[in-house]
């Protein structure tokens, strides 16, 4: 598993914990990403262990994320914030913090978040 993908998953763990718990739906998304990123069994074990306790953006190795991976993390974070049926205030707040931490320009971030929210809401209708 590439270091950038590891950092993306860790970032998503912090988003999942934003509302104080990790839902079953959020766990499913994280597990799917481990598979999609071809995590080795040892890496998957490490990330599952990492996800067992509350995490914040301070726990995310953002410096390991390149240009595209930063945007990927933001888009996945928005999706993850909706996967349990609704985006709550804590999840909105961590996405705003994530935009700052990822150093994505405000206008670009606004468009990425808006597009991701629209896709997330459409996907929710399919579930």
Task: Report the location of each language-model feature.
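Small-residue-enriched hydrophobic alpha-helices in membranes
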Residues: 1-127
């Amino acid at each position: 598993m590439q270091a950038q993908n590891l950092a993306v998953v860790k970032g998503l763990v912090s988003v999942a914990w934003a509302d104080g718990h990790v839902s079953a739906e959020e766990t499913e998304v994280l597990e799917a990403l481990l598979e999609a990123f071809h995590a080795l069994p040892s890496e998957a074990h490490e990330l599952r262990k990492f996800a067992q306790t509350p995490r914040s953006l301070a726990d995310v190795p953002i410096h390991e994320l390149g240009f595209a991976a930063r945007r990927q993390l933001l888009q996945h974070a928005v999706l993850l914030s909706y996967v349990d049926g609704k985006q709550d205030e804590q999840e909105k707040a961590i996405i705003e913090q994530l935009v700052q931490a990822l150093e994505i320009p405000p206008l670009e971030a606004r468009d990425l978040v808006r597009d991701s929210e629209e896709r997330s809401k459409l996907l929710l209708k399919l579930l």
